[in-house]
């Protein structure tokens, strides 16, 4: 999402002072977000056309770390249709406000609302998927279930089994992506590529989980052959 990046101590100080549950932003900030979203969507549309891909075949997920509820709503009003959070604690703070305000707009959020929408025969197009895109510690699973639809950072059988058990106990099915460290960089998380097929098969057979694909980040290099 549009905004300045903050790291380290500056990020900690920022998080201490920002009310992430805030639901109201001024018109200038809303317009800034709208303009940023439209620029990105236009670039995606141009890239799809240049690559000969169907319009809408590339899905944009807005990473909403450090953005408050009002800012996220502005992004959704501008055309964002999938959101992702890095931190379980931010999901906890924002989920209720987002679900309430999105409901007023005719949308549903996350796995709970999706189930309710299905019961009410609501159109699937009104659903806003909510992803966890950051690392998940086992003791934080309860913070993200049953709010998120998809957990994108599953990199071991142990973590998958714990998520599956919690999901089954709640009577829900959670989407997961198997995180693969295909670049081999030690600074990145994920299983080794040589283990990916075996892990994917085992995770795909677990109750309570729906394996949706892989999450990978390529090496930060300019060589197109290496990237591919």
PLM segments and residue spans:
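N-terminal amphipathic/basic-hydrophobic helices that include classical n-h-c signal peptides
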Residues: 1-11
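Conserved alpha/beta-domain cores
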Residues: 12-228
